[in-house]
Amino acid sequence: MPVAAPKLVPNEQHFHIPGPCEELSLFLRFLPAERASTPRRAVLYVHGATFPSALSIAHRFDGRSWRDALNDAGFDVWGLDFHGFGHSDRYPEMSASAEKAAPLLVADDAARQVEAAARFILAHEDLHKLSIISHSWGAMPACRFAAAHPALVDRLVLFGPIARRPPRRYETPPKFPAWRLVTLEDQWNRFVEDVPVHEPPVLSRRHFEEWGERYLDSDAESRSRDPFGVKTPLGPFSEIIKAWHSQLAYDPTAVCAPVAIIRGEWDGLINDDDTRWLFDAFSQSPVKRDIKISRATHLMHLEAQRMALWEESIGFLNGAGPALVPA
């Protein structure tokens, strides 16, 4: 069940808006820039497969978040919680046995949730277009939306996106239930599994323990389970696995917006071959960047190199890059 949404900072604004699923509302958190640019610029953050906006772009380590950095650069920042996450309504199927339904929150459904959020934001701010930052699986609904509604999208920052991998001979993707429980141990393992054994941790235990408590707070029933765990829709994970069986949930060639792919050197979910394929597949994008940041993994936004991610994303959203020189 969703929990009441405390403000992370005093000037944060909260909105519950209608979503594409009947009788289910979506939650948006909004932090306007104190010194807004002229004209105003809005960024929508689209989260990944296991935790919502409060635990990602809005989470502060040592008093500062990615959202704060974007605000300082003049961007109004919005965070969407998909159905089944954070403060958005849960799918009714999440109250039943996980085996009784197909994986919840697939990209087609999620893209319609992104559209509902984007149209609300544009109307609220009286803007014609916005930029999107997505993480991991979140690139799938973000790019589906961008392809279907090119006039509404300024720029796309795809942080740790999932790419299509070649089909596996004699192998089909496994089937998954509707949802699963994700424990703190599951999340900690994600932070350490891709770090080379001879390298120091990319996230301190102190920071993880602080983040972990907030993660459990995102599901009102998490601490009633043994072990503690957050109920999470499995559509995103199922689509990651399908992408690695040559079934990517969107067509990159249909995206017309400028695109930046930002990834960590140690990101096991998008390697150099994946990135090259995805970069080339964005064939209609007028501006493309492939940015690899050292000593970082798939969860770079919560790691020691997070500020490098912030800087690169802001630079791209600002249109930074080499000028085109006439031939």
Regions found by a protein language model. Name each.
Residues 128-133, 137-167:
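Conserved hydrolase catalytic core segment
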